[in-house]
């Protein structure tokens, strides 16, 4: 891992956080008690709780694999998944049971600024990509969910920190090795309305 990269790993499950701490320590990425020299910080936050999300600080890039299995699809999962994976990690506890609740929540957090993204990654001129052409969010999605998630983010209205125009959010969909739509990638571009293409 590059010394200038700092990762904040976030989860709401105590067992997952403990395992992440063990992994960071095993790979000498943990520094000294979550100090500034740590390359990986492990933090608790619940995506459904505004306060815990607001305490996280700001990021250049958010990578997320939220629960996306619909509640009624749990029993139909292959036993190799259902019997060994956490129900909370796959289905979660979002009020909506269609598997899209966490994406709606992510989009709302993005619009409200509760997922705080660094201004330094934004382009100097409207319409240009930001520093290093980094997206601001990368999210794994379930089968058939990419079009809805993409549409939600492309119509998101995110106010620029200094006022003025809203950011323009543009999305792309990446496919896995089997050709399935697997990841929605979000870019935030400077000024000029909202929407995307």
Predicted regions and their residues:
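Conserved SAM/SAH cofactor-binding pocket of Class I
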Residues: 1-74
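Short phosphate-engaging motifs
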Residues: 16, 77, 145
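Short amphipathic alpha-helical segments
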Residues: 21-22, 74-78, 150-153
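Conserved RecA-like P-loop NTPase ATPase core
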Residues: 65, 81, 106
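Conserved Class I SAM-dependent methyltransferase catalytic core
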Residues: 94-188
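Flexible, glycine-/basic-rich loop-and-beta segments that form/coincide
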Residues: 190-197
């Amino acid at each position: 891992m590059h010394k200038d990269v700092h990762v904040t790993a976030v989860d709401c499950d105590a067992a997952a956080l403990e395992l992440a701490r063990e992994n960071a320590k095993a790979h000498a990425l943990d520094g000294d008690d979550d100090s500034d020299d740590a390359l990986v910080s492990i933090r608790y936050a619940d995506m459904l709780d505004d306060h815990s999300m607001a305490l996280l600080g700001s990021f250049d890039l958010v990578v997320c694999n939220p629960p996306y299995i619909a509640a009624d699809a749990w029993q139909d999962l292959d036993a190799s998944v259902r019997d060994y994976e956490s129900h909370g990690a796959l289905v979660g506890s979002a009020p909506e049971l269609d598997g899209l609740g966490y994406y709606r929540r992510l989009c709302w957090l993005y619009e409200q600024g509760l997922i705080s993204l660094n201004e330094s990654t934004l382009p100097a001129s409207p319409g240009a990509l930001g520093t290093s052409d980094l997206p601001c969010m990368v999210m794994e999605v379930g089968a058939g969910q990419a079009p809805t998630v993409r549409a939600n983010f492309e119509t998101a209205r995110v106010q620029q920190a200094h006022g003025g125009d809203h950011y323009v959010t543009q999305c792309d969909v990446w496919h896995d090795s089997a050709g399935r739509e697997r990841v929605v990638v979000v870019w935030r571009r400077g000024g000029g309305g909202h929407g995307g293409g």
